[in-house]
Regions:
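Short hairpin/turn module used for nucleic-acid contact or packing/dimerization
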Residues: 237-247
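Transmembrane beta-barrel wall of Gram-negative outer-membrane proteins
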Residues: 70-82
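Short, flexible N-terminal segments of the mature chain
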Residues: 34-42
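Cleavable N-terminal export/targeting peptides
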Residues: 1-13, 42-45, 78, 247
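Short N-terminal segments immediately surrounding and downstream of signal-peptide cleavage
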Residues: 9-23
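Outer-membrane beta-barrel translocator/channel fold
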Residues: 19-34, 49-70, 84-102, 106-239
Length: 247
């Protein structure tokens, strides 16, 4: 596998992880295991990820495999881009197709502006166009970020979300703790009404990256999301863990 990388490429990390989400009521659960490689090639950083997932409902079960890759490229001191693409089996586990293009602009000291576009095709040929913009502020060991995202779904129309995150770096070492808070809307269509109905969504997630040795990091994540739809209210509890070996 590694021989496929160019001679001037340097493998920087390998990650293996597991992610479990349990939904309330009859919404089932989702299991995800993945392996990930990150390599550095001159001004580019390359990511390769292979995931295996399972989505269980009360009476139905789906399995799927997803492959994805991303390239971060530093054009100069103030412009960095990220291009990502992913493909998966046609099931409710993952999006079938996923393409994203992000642009990061360091136009002010200790400030990073971000904008981007994302196209996703889901199970049953539902397509979603996503536009997002945000800003990150770097103040000592704290990184504070805000992002606004607009979604345009082929079957339900528009919705949006607002996300705030705060990351606190450890005084020494590479460990950190990060909190995400988000709130937004959801658009839904039903056979029994010609009108698009709207609901809401909110979530909270906390992650700890803990160095175990100079090369090995442990990541632990816990989160919860609440869905308020026109026909049902439910929530999902997420627990995730990963190990990263750095070269």
């Amino acid at each position: 596998m590694f021989s496929a990388l160019p001679a001037y490429a340097g493998l920087t990390s390998i990650t293996a992880g597991y992610d479990f989400t349990d939904y309330s009521g009859d919404h089932g659960n989702r299991n995800l295991a993945y392996a990930e490689l990150v390599a550095k090639v001159e001004n580019a950083t390359l990511l390769f990820n292979l995931s295996q997932g399972r989505r269980d409902y009360e009476t139905e079960h789906f399995n799927a495999t997803r492959g994805q890759g991303a390239v971060w490229y530093k054009w100069n001191n103030w412009l960095t881009t990220r291009t990502g693409i992913a493909f998966a089996d046609n099931t409710p586990v993952f999006a079938r197709q996923d393409f994203r293009q992000d642009i990061n602009l360091a136009l002010l000291p200790k400030t990073l502006f971000t904008t981007g576009y994302r196209y996703t095709k889901y199970y049953d040929d539902v397509e979603v166009d996503v536009w997002q913009g945000g800003v990150s502020l770097y103040t000592g060991p704290v990184i504070t970020s805000y992002r606004y995202t607009h979604y345009d779904s082929s079957d339900a129309g528009g919705s949006y979300s607002n996300m705030i995150s705060v990351r606190l770096n450890d005084p020494r070492g590479t460990g950190y703790t990060q909190l995400w808070l988000s709130r937004g809307t959801g658009a839904y269509t039903y056979d029994w009404t010609p009108e698009t109905r709207y609901g809401s969504m909110k979530s909270v997630s906390l992650q700890r990256i803990q160095p175990l040795t100079e090369q090995l990091n442990l990541g632990l994540t816990a989160g919860k999301v609440w869905y308020d739809t026109p026909t049902d209210d439910y929530n999902g509890l997420q627990l995730a863990a990963h190990l990263t070996w750095k070269f």
